[in-house]
Structure formats: C-alpha cells, structure tokens
Regions:
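Active-site neighborhood for divalent-cation/phosphate handling
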Residues: 54, 58-153
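N-terminal phosphate-binding loop and adjacent alpha-helix
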Residues: 15-46, 79, 223-224
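Short, intrinsically disordered, charge-balanced linker/junction segments flanking boundaries
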Residues: 1-4, 81, 222-227
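Adenine-nucleotide phosphate-binding core of ATP-dependent small-molecule kinases
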Residues: 209-227
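Phosphate/pyrophosphate-binding loops at sites that engage ATP/ADP/AMP, CoA/4′-phosphopantetheine
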Residues: 41-54, 133, 204
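Gly/Thr-rich phosphate-binding beta-strand-loop-beta motif of the actin/hexokinase/Hsp70
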Residues: 1-22, 55-58, 152-193, 198-201
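Switch/connector loops and helix/strand junctions flanking conserved nucleotide-binding motifs
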Residues: 2, 29-30, 64-68
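Small-residue helix-packing motif on alpha-helices
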Residues: 79, 204-205, 209-212
Length: 227
C-alpha cells in the first residue's frame, strides 16, 4: 500500500491519494517475494505519479529487533551514550552490523527508551527494492511504531487501555496502550496461515484457497455482538 500526504497550512497531514497492490503470499513462492514487491511498488508509483519521490516506509515488526529499556536519572547530554551502552547489551548482533535508533518515551514515570535495530544487509535489500522501483528512501519506520503514531495522531492519548491487532499476510502486530505507556509484540502468524490451512483441509491450491477465503469467509464477531 502507498499513500500520498501533503502538509496543510496548519501543519496537519492531509491524505491526497492512496492505492494498493496484492502480492501472492504462497509459501511456495517465497523466493519471488522481493521481485513481486519491486513490481508492485513500481506499479503503485506509476499510478500515483510519484516520479522519483522520496518515500517513508515501515518494515514488518518481525524483521526488526525491538527492546524497551529503563534509564536511570541522568543529564540529557548523557542519554545517547547510555542508550548506546544499553543497545550493546540487548541487540543480539554487533552494533557495527546493524542499523539502529532509539526514541525516548514521553510521559513515562521513569525515563524509558525504545531501541530498534535491523541487520544492515536486510535493510539494504529492502532499500534496494524501493530504489529499483524508481523511488528513494527518506525515512524508515517500524510497522508497530507507525501504527502507534497513527493512532495517537488520530485519537490522541486514550483514556482507557487499548489493544490494536494489525493482521498482515505473514505477521500480526499486537499493540497495547495504557496511558502514556505502550507495548508491542509481533507474531509470525497472519492471513497466509489461514489460507494454507484451508488449502490443506480441502486439498486445493493456495490461490484457490485465498479466493475462497476472501469470497466466502465470515468474521466471528463474538457472542457480545448485537446483530
């Protein structure tokens, strides 16, 4: 999916256009996923007339290491040094092999930071796909964090606890918010797993199972839902 935003005179983001393209999530075609993505992004860029625009995109939470760390009371000038030390302790790869960043969490009772990291070669592959589509990279975000920022931008700080469930093809992101605190977890289960289960149960192809799921699937809204 690609969306085009513009900044209003008041500084708010305004959605100008949006489009999406389907990618086959068949595990048997996993080797072609990068090429599928490149073609899809290129087609979207052409339809939305993006030219050689710089884009901001989000990476699946499953592909990124995320860790929340508490920081002791320190001077603001020493925060980056301390977070770097924490990253060295928690990131499961040498820092010279990853691209990483952090963000301080506003409003927490204790000073807290969220650290995100991705292997450099993995990010290069994703950037390569974007660049080969004729676009350039402005910023890279992590899907759960982008979801959090989008929710806060639209609804502000929730008064009650909120759980957002973002179900993708291969990965689902869980985002739990309580006051100013939030917690994320990415699990390697998504819509493709349901499609694969249908294909196995009825002895049909993945593509046929996907069609059946979309055409005939029903969502169970639970006993508490009033028709």
């Amino acid at each position: 999916s690609v969306a085009v935003f513009e900044t209003s005179k008041g500084g708010d983001l305004v959605l100008k256009s949006y489009d999406s393209e389907s990618i086959v999530a068949d595990p048997a075609l996993e080797a072609s996923r990068i090429s599928q993505s490149r073609i899809a992004i290129g087609d979207l860029a052409q339809r939305l007339k993006l030219g050689k625009s710089k884009v901001r995109y989000a990476i699946s939470g499953q592909a990124v290491f995320t860790r929340f760390v508490k920081l002791p009371p320190i001077q603001a000038d020493n925060v980056e040094q301390l977070v770097t030390f924490e990253a060295q302790q928690h990131v499961p790869f040498p820092l010279e092999e990853v691209v990483w960043d952090y963000e301080l969490i506003d409003g927490a009772a204790e000073k807290e930071a969220v650290i995100v990291a991705i292997k450099g070669d993995a990010l290069d592959e994703i950037n390569g796909t974007v660049n080969e589509s004729g676009l350039a990279t402005a910023e890279v975000d992590v899907a759960p964090m982008a979801l959090y920022n989008a929710f806060r931008a639209a609804y502000g700080q929730p008064e009650e606890s909120v759980l957002l469930v973002d179900i993708g093809a291969k990965t689902s992101n869980l985002l739990y918010m309580e006051g100013t605190r939030f917690f994320t977890r990415s699990v390697p289960v998504g819509g493709a797993a349901i499609t694969a289960a249908i294909a196995k149960e009825y002895h049909i192809s993945f593509l046929d199972a996907e069609h059946q799921k979309i055409s005939n699937g029903l969502v169970g809204l639970g006993a508490g839902y009033d028709q």
